Amino acid sequence: MREAGKRTRGRGTTARPGRPRQAEVARLAGVSQTTVSLVLGKKTGGAAISEETRQKVVGAAESLGYVPDPAARRLAAARNNLLGVFSFTATFPTDVQHSYYPFLVGVEQEAAAQGYDLVLFTGSSPGGTGGGTHALHRARLADGCLILGRHAPTAELCRLVAEGFPVVHLGRRDEPEGPAWVGADYVSASRGVVERLVALGHRRIVLVREDDEAPASTDREQGVREGLEEAGLPVGPEAVFRSADPARELTSDRVREWVADGVTAFVAEETDTSAAWRALNAALAEAGLNCPGDVSLALLGSPPPDAADGPTPAGFDIPRAQLGAAAVRLLAALVAGEQASEPLVACTFRPGDTLAPPRRTSPQPPDPLPGPRVPGRGRNRNTRTEQGEPTQ
């Protein structure tokens, strides 16, 4: 594999602006500061406040990032050595089986080494109680925040950055004015997997991926295309299969068609759902194709923990704990007001058990289970019946 890329991304920080005040909330909501105090303090004091007014105040407070908790305001007066962790995933990755859990291991270890405590904002997950993106206004309880998840809200993150709040996203991002980030070199790693397949003799390779514009997905596809192009292999639309619903669209019939057309190797991306990988495995099994006897198979990432019983797929491993630690170092530097950056982290090739040279002839998937035998069917056209007449 080539040397890991050296694209870096850091962001200096200026002094953090003052936190929004109740007076600002009042101006935005079009009410008095007394009303704001009563609503946010959850005390009516005998005053009759309509639900419409209350919603205006709450909405204005959230849009400004106002934190009404007095304890939070005391924490804001100075650095408090707290780093927040937001996870925009279906569940917060505290389960050891979660693909993001190793990130948290690296985050925790490096935070301890840097002298920081962690605040886990579980409300950022859809299953939490904080309302997803709206939970980000609570990030100001900490000195800075780490963000996990392929689909973190761009507008909300850019707003925090514009206000001078230190934010680091775990994973490459494309927005010039977005948060600082740390990431793995998926381009080089994916290109290296294709190079290994080409060295084994494969000339028709298909990438299976989700229909997603996340940088981690586009980087993997770029690496695959670079590997194919350097080998002089087809890089057109037929080289990549994108699907918004792999479990439904990636069928055994489609896999059989690819193999009949000369495809000898498949590559799938890893995501937090592993949808493409799971669908590809299911389709190959249903088609009766063995790996690596009939086709070779590679995974651009680590296999999901709940699929550890089968053969180890070839591909690459992502240094998740190392990335988590790098994210904390970068965030700590930004909190301190320093210019900082972290290089892309190289992935490690995993030989696995699913690669082999292609068969000299395309494998013939088994026919469906036969039904009742019908005379004259299922024979070669050139054979003859017992009466000596050709079959139709």
Language model region names:
Residues 90-102, 120-129, 182-192, 208-254, ...:
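Hinge/beta->alpha junction and helix N-cap segments in small-molecule ligand-binding domains
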Residues 35-38, 78-92, 196, 204-210:
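Short beta-strand segments enriched in small/hydrophobic residues
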Residues 1-79, 362, 369, 373-391:
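N-terminal helix-turn-helix DNA-binding module of bacterial transcription factors
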Residues 129-141, 249-261:
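Short, well-structured alpha-helical segments in soluble
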Residues 252-392:
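Flexible loop/turn connectors
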Residues 51, 55, 63-134:
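Amphipathic helical "hinge" segments at domain boundaries
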Residues 148-188, 301-313:
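Flexible loop/hinge segments that line or gate small-molecule binding clefts
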